[in-house]
């Protein structure tokens, strides 16, 4: 019996949380757990609490049930997924504070082990990989598999990032065996962009600069530019990864303005630099 299964025993209600600005792994893991509970623990009252996210993930079952505001509900167990620290839970940390027990499932090397119980194997490719190992494979349906596969492809860059392991590929194969349309999931959630998203991506690439003999690349988008194109933070998805693919680049840095002189910073590296340590120094964290 896994740690998650032990904590679900005799539990009557579960709040499922992820991090602010939810991405593919966050949505995949939270909705994956939600669908698994609905199928295998029908007597448990469960709800997912997340900020608004990109509609490109609307194919995930349960997407339309996500709650975007703190309400008056109370839960016995709080499960936090893909969030390295309490602050990244945003306003929804309220449910962690009031729960009788809590579990943190994550894979980020910067995780602060803030849960009552923590499962954080930082060698895992994604939180969806961590979650898969906590579930009963035989009790997964296609909808849960779609969620988990979505998270894995997003945090592995469709299996090309260094975090991808043989175990990752083994899990992906098992999820494919559940009958998911893996090609459509990859195209619709990872590659396909709107015309406006392609425009802002092009702007970010056009305005980028390199330094340190071309080993670092930097780009930034101002709020005025975002207003001109009619985009928000959700439309910035994928820009940092495209910058990282520039030939000769080891570190990519991308900023977009969220308020007067306030910026959301994303960093990605190839192999030599651990950018998660830089992020942690400034109170952030995440992938290498």
Where are these regions (language model features)?
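Short alpha-helices
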Residues: 105-171
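A generic local secondary-structure boundary/capping motif
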Residues: 68-69, 91-94, 118-121, 138-139, ...
